[in-house]
């Protein structure tokens, strides 16, 4: 379909394209003209090669300006800094649907944003050899007026395509666009990033790398407090990102030079637990950023757990297989301790579980605070102190924990109950 527009054209253009049932789309601004042969020439190129996503003509100015509109050849590196494809270009309707059409948030240069959406993950652009577009220029035309909206355009593009700009420019698109790569190199010296991505999730490297830029604007908030959890859909997979708050000044120095960040420890410890066949959501990666040699924000990324419940649910609702669930949690705790791992934030919200046909699945989260070394009987039983429950629940936990570690179950129960009472008493005094 050929779509013409003027004035409120962006709105009408979106509506017209959404209603079209044709295979190909060609937007043409009402002031401009195309040659009678352009569409047939362009369709030939699209049908000849399925990798071709966009076919555009050579163009000539008419109106207040004359001569050929000499646009540079297409490349992703150049597309990251400037648009070299006019709105008048033929593309498949399926591409428009795939990227969600023209962005409604951006109020200028929507064609540039659209071409980035279509082409950033690959695809060819063909420019026909002959002049087949006649582009009208008037004093005060939209292209000239759009220049005043440059800060807005830059902000929206960075928000929507941070991964693309990171890959092509090494960071954000800057207001002086041609200097973007150099500015980003200089900034990276003073604001270095540290990151790692698990080999199985290398396709998410760009996402992990730009978390300091995109975290506040994307995703769904799961929890917000001292730290923040957000869920993202990346490449069809649900992932959870934990953003750790910026530490106080002394710790900013310590984390920058001497100590692993919480995000990095979470990533490393999750991989360690999974090596020991202890359940934990698959770690994807981490990213941290510093500023002027002071540690800043850090982010840990993992797959979203498929476990629908936490230990906190056990005292609050009936579970038909409650004893099996408690025994599975006790066994998981015992395996942790037998491997010399003591979780120092072993609370009800950090133990997840799911009831499956093959048995109860347990996963441990919030892993940045671990202690490594031999875990004694007393230390192991004290580790249950923050888990609420009834006497019957503690009896099951103690019995299974004792069996798994070869301890006396009566002694374990005694120590677990003592630790729980001490913790409850301390909490009451603090509150």
Predicted features and spans:
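Conserved ATP-binding subdomain of kinase catalytic cores across diverse folds
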Residues: 210-308, 338
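Acidic donor-binding loop at a coil-to-helix junction in glycosyltransferase catalytic cores
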Residues: 107-114
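Catalytic beta-strand/loop signature of glycosyltransferases that borders the donor
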Residues: 58, 126-132
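Conserved donor NDP-sugar-binding/catalytic core segment of glycosyltransferases
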Residues: 37-68
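C-lobe/activation-segment region of protein kinase-like
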Residues: 363-425
């Amino acid at each position: 379909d050929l779509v013409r527009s003027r004035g409120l054209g962006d709105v009408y253009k979106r509506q017209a394209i959404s209603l079209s049932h044709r295979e190909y789309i060609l937007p043409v601004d009402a002031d401009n003209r195309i040659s009678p042969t352009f569409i047939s020439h362009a369709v030939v190129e699209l049908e000849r090669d399925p990798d071709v996503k966009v076919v555009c003509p050579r163009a000539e100015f008419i109106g207040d300006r004359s001569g050929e509109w000499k646009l540079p050849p297409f490349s992703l590196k150049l597309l990251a800094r400037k648009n070299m494809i006019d709105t008048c270009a033929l593309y498949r309707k399926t591409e428009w649907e795939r990227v969600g059409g023209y962005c409604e948030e951006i109020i200028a240069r929507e064609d540039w944003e659209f071409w980035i959406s279509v082409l950033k993950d690959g695809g060819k652009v063909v420019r026909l050899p002959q002049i087949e577009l006649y582009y009208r220029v008037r004093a005060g035309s939209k292209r000239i007026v759009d220049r005043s909206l440059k800060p807005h355009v830059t902000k929206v593009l960075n928000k929507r395509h941070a991964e693309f700009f990171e890959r092509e420019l090494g960071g954000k698109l800057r207001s002086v666009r041609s200097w973007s790569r150099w500015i980003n190199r200089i900034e990276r010296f003073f604001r270095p990033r540290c990151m790692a991505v698990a080999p199985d999730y290398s396709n998410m490297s760009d996402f992990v790398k730009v978390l300091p830029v995109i975290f506040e604007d994307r995703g769904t908030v799961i929890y917000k407090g001292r730290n923040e959890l957000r869920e993202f859909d990346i490449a069809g997979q649900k992932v959870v990102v934990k953003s750790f708050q910026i530490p106080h000044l002394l710790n900013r120095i310590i984390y920058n030079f001497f100590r692993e960040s919480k995000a990095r420890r979470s990533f490393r410890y999750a991989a360690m637990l999974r090596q020991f066949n202890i359940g934990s959501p698959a770690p994807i990666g981490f990213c941290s950023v510093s500023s002027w040699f002071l540690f800043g924000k850090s982010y840990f990324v993992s797959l979203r757990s498929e476990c629908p419940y936490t230990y906190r649910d056990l005292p609050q609702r009936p579970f038909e297989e409650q004893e099996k669930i408690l025994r599975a949690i006790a066994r998981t705790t015992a395996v942790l301790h037998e491997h010399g791992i003591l979780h120092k934030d072993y609370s009800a919200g950090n133990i997840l579980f799911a009831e499956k046909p093959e048995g109860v699945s347990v996963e441990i989260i919030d892993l940045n605070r671990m202690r490594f070394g031999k875990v004694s009987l007393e230390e192991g039983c004290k580790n249950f102190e923050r888990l609420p429950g009834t006497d019957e629940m503690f009896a099951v936990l103690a019995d299974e924990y004792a069996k798994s570690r070869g301890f006396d179950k009566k002694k374990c129960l005694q120590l677990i109950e003592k630790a729980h009472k001490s913790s409850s008493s301390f909490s009451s005094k603090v509150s």
